[in-house]
């Protein structure tokens, strides 16, 4: 459920990877109007805004390289570039870790977010590939995000 002032919307994306189709449904729970639905076909693997974080963790991240990622959101497909910017030692809740910084180009006129801004995400270079830090810069200000805790199911190793 997304609320922006008086505007409220509930949205859902259903991915059918066998049929290579995504169906997007959006409705206002405060209105009796039928939901707005759109469907589109895709020809390559595609992510939504949440699974893209997992997808980025599975990629080979070499400093100086970049790659494109297709993402479906709000009934459209966006392609954005991800630059692998730097390698850095960070102090984190996990202790001192080697991490790589990626900068997904989400912002801009044709971007997923039609505003000025920048996002950086640091992912550990160990086998866990955990996102331990992020920084979001927008007109409103700069937001620093840090991983606070990691928990594993019983019986799973922590490293």
Could you tell me what each predicted segment is?
Residues 1-63:
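Contiguous hydrophobic, core-forming segments of folded domains
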């Amino acid at each position: 459920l997304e609320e922006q002032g008086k505007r409220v919307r509930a949205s859902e994306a259903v991915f059918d990877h066998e049929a290579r189709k995504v169906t997007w449904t959006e409705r206002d729970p405060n209105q009796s109007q039928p939901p707005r639905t759109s469907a589109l076909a895709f020809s390559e693997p595609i992510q939504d805004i949440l699974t893209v974080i997992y997808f980025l963790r599975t990629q080979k991240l070499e400093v100086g390289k970049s790659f494109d990622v297709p993402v479906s959101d709000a009934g459209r497909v966006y392609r954005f570039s991800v630059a692998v910017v730097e390698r850095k030692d960070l102090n984190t809740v996990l202790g001192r870790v080697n991490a790589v910084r990626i900068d997904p180009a989400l912002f801009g006129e044709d971007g997923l977010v039609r505003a000025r801004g920048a996002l950086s995400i640091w992912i550990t270079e160990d086998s866990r590939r955990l996102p331990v830090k992020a920084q979001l810069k927008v007109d409103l200000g700069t937001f620093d995000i840090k991983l606070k805790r990691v928990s594993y199911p019983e019986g799973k190793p922590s490293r």
